[in-house]
Amino acid sequence: MARRGIAKQVTLSLLLAILTVTFLYPLYFMLINSLKSRTEYFVNPFSLPRGALQFENYSTMISQFKILNLFKNSFFVSAGTVVLLLVVCVFASYVFAKYRFRGRTAIYLAVLTTMFIPSQVTIIPLYVLFSKMGLVNRYWSVILSYLALFLPEAILLMTANFRAIIDELLEAAEMDGCGYFQRVRHVVVPMGRAAIFLSIIFYFITAWNDLFTPMIFLQSMDKRTVMVALAALMGRYTGAPTLQFAGLLLSAVPALVVYIIFQRHIIRGLSVGAIK
Amino acid sequence: MKRLFTFSLLLVFLLASVAITLSSCGGKKEAVKLTVWMNGADSIIGPTEQQKPQDQWYVSQAFRRFEKANPGVTLELVVQADQGAAHTNFKTAGLAGNAPDVANLWTGQPIFALKEVILSLDKLVPADDLKYIVGWESVRDGFKPDGTILGYPAAQNQICHMLYNKAIVKKAGMDWEANPPRTIEEFDSALAKIKAIGVTPIVVDEAAQGVPWFFCWVADYWWTQMTTNDGILEETYGRKKFAEDKGFLATLAYYRSMYVKGFFRKDLTTANDSFTQFLNGKGALWPAVTSFLADAEKSLGADCGVLLPPEFDPNAKLVNSTVGGPGQSFVVAKNTKYPQMAVKLISFLNSKAEVLAAQKINRYPIVRTDVTPEEMGWVPGSNIAKLHKYSTTYNYWVDNLLTSGPAEIFYTQTSLVAVGKMTPLQLAEAMDKKAAAQ
Amino acid sequence: MTHTTRASLRDSAIGRKRTRIKRLEIFLSLLPVVLILLVFRVYPIVTALAKSFTNWDGLYRSDWVGLRNYVTFVQEGTFWMILRNTLILLLNVPLQVFIGIVVALLLYERVAGWRIYRAVIYTPQIISAVIIGFLFKIFFGFEGPFNAVLKAVGLGTLAIEWFGNSYTALGVIVFSIVWFSIGWQAIVILGGMSSIPPSVFEAAVIDGANYWQRAFRIVIPMLVRVLEFSIIASGVWTLTQLFPFLFAMTKGGPGYETSTLDYMIYLKSYGLGFGRDYGTATAVAMILLLLVLALTVIEMRLANRADDWG
């Protein structure tokens, strides 16, 4: 690494630094505006707050808007989706990656094809279907919708990753008497954990931030997710933007936490040798 | 054997008595539960309320009052995050048979399109309501005075106007409180005077909201002065042509000339900060509806004025008016189990007492003829009182007259005419093509 | 057991039982996936396909009209513009992949401050598209900061109305998508790099390869499968999930100049709350589906590496 030109290194570092600043700017924007009064925001959205800092936006969010309750709903949906997604995906991807059977390519491609369907189109038939199943306004409707949406992409990711697992490891495990579940537990999951952690990050955050699906399927006030509730704060004619920013900032926290916890593990796999 | 027999008899007795008690429970007055969808931000629930806990909102308290007056009834409030999507949701829920008993939707074509899943209220609306509430034409199918009643106009009214900055106008040598521009020529020269002192006359985000703001709030009035609402209806139903509508073409031509003369900001179709600019004195006028008055008055104080649109055609039958009216409605789903109770609730929300209570929180010109501005506590001559004068003489929202085909073109492409990317005739022809395909 | 070959295993009774167990494993592993997708994806899309040949208004009107929806839509003056927009926006994919690789390499090599960068790069993905769209719109607005900077450095002639014209608006949107996606690309690639044994790198160093040679000749070929994933996933995202961004930034405008097929589906089915045009909306969705399939097939053919999928 020392052999690379210092100039090159400095330029790259500088670019990364600039990039980092731009990445953080939206959070900064929401922060300064969440501390302003509504009229002050309309007058200048980019200045630092001039009047008294409106911490009430945050206290309102917690005590009166009951954002923690909304977190609970979002969490049930996001965590439920991720857990089920992992369970279904790991086994399916393992089979796609390491087993040979007739029709494997066909089924794999068929699964992938469902990825290409935009969700706006399936939402109405799904609503009618869930209505007949009595699942409207239950978490299951959103979880199942997300599962159907995320499965193909997650399988694509995990299969790509699992294929890199060295066959000899699996054979060795089988020779040692490991059954199917044990092979998954002792070989596939540890070796494929990059893809697993990536999936946890992607799909938890995608589900957490999604507006469209829960807006349609979870309408009762006590089951609304955070993003849906916050969207109701801005209409075409009126709105409470500063309050909304406080809420958005607060709801970014769990997503960031999930990311920070799991992203360390993705790179940790670097130094761990594969052949023990 | 005898024991067994006695035992069985006892058991049967027990079961019978339990069954009888249970069935008599069902005979008592059944609990009535109504689900109500409310617009989250643009209607009865205002921005200031969502800062309070839900049970302190005006609408929640109104519900409690209703429940108290009608024991056995519970109301479940559902806030719709996106009013546009609410219509599609209502439609889908209606298809599935579980649309909410009462829903707060828009008026006009949006609910006409849903009439297959909306309950007709012809036989259910009390006569007093028909008498004292304004705006029924907006909820009657086809806007006909005898059309099926599809809902109630919601208890508030938006009136279109232009907010203006008195200080800038004064600097340009005018006083619009004493002498507002009332003809299109006066308006034109007034804007030119403002431009002459170096201030952008009209700041507006013409496309940022997906709706051409200036055109919808102001120019639509000019259009309907010449063509009348009925004329526009004929065109949207395909019986007449937009391309032959002289009023429409003339309005569009003037709209384009306003841009050419520099009366609009240059980035008309891509801007999204016009309200901010207006509040900072960088623009003289900003087209608005009543909801924005409070924020504008807070920022500009005494410098905040309201200007009603000038007359494009002084010989028109429609004068001294502006676009507005009940843009929101309350509808009842066809699949409701309690139609009378649903109507009773809506009637309650529109009652004089409730309207007065609601207005304490959200100021709008109101839809009842038996409420005076004094009762509302509005100072005569104040901006809100000025707007209130139009609460019975408004001209119903022109863009809600359009059916979805022409509406799609109108909403997405009208702003292009201002910047010259499309000619008025091209816009009209595109709308005709859609109207014909319906 | 350890001395018998696979073939004899298969032939014996134990071998046949093994095969049966394996078949069961395959079946049960794939069953949940197939079921979920059939019920919640295939069934709705088949319904949608059927509806695309009708004049369905979302409610009870549903008369067969054959290919009319498709024909009308393709014949609308805006169809080719929309198609063009959709394809131009796809240019973001190679850009984000390239930058993503560079960033991933830098993080892998632990450039100064890498921990901070790694923690921060995913942030845009966590922020709602509405805020991102709003900020980009202001930033590149006619009177916004970007133009102000251009004027300040004397490039005033370039300070145009970025969102006012099709190509420049699309350019800004591509830029914003790349900005938004760098973090995602980088961690996907890092994830892929984590399964490359360090011995490969060590061997390369011994062989005397310098940094860039190591990076591009060795690492990238090993990442092919991961890159294939990220290219397909970002391509599909651009084609089917871009809607919130477009809505926040341009609303598909001016006019239809930045509308895509994905956006048109929204407009036709939800547009302003009373879209009656579900028949056309589903037809557009079918057209989009065909487009995506076509592009993916092309991509897979181009990336035809030797592996046992073919």
List PLM regions with ranges.
Chain B
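Conserved N-terminal structural module of periplasmic/extracytoplasmic solute-binding proteins
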Residues: 19-111, 115, 129, 176-177, ...
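Conserved C-terminal helix/tail region of periplasmic/extracytoplasmic solute-binding proteins
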Residues: 74, 78, 170, 355, ...
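Hinge/lid segment of periplasmic solute-binding proteins
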Residues: 81, 106-160, 215-216, 305-308
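Short, solvent-exposed loop/beta-turn-alpha elements that line the ligand-binding surface or hinge
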Residues: 122-135, 179-180, 202, 223-250, ...
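Extracytoplasmic/periplasmic solute-binding protein
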Residues: 144-155, 160, 185-238, 283
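Glycine-centered hinge/linker elements that transmit conformational signals in sensory
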Residues: 188-193, 234-268
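Extracytoplasmic/periplasmic substrate-recognition and gating elements
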Residues: 261, 298-363
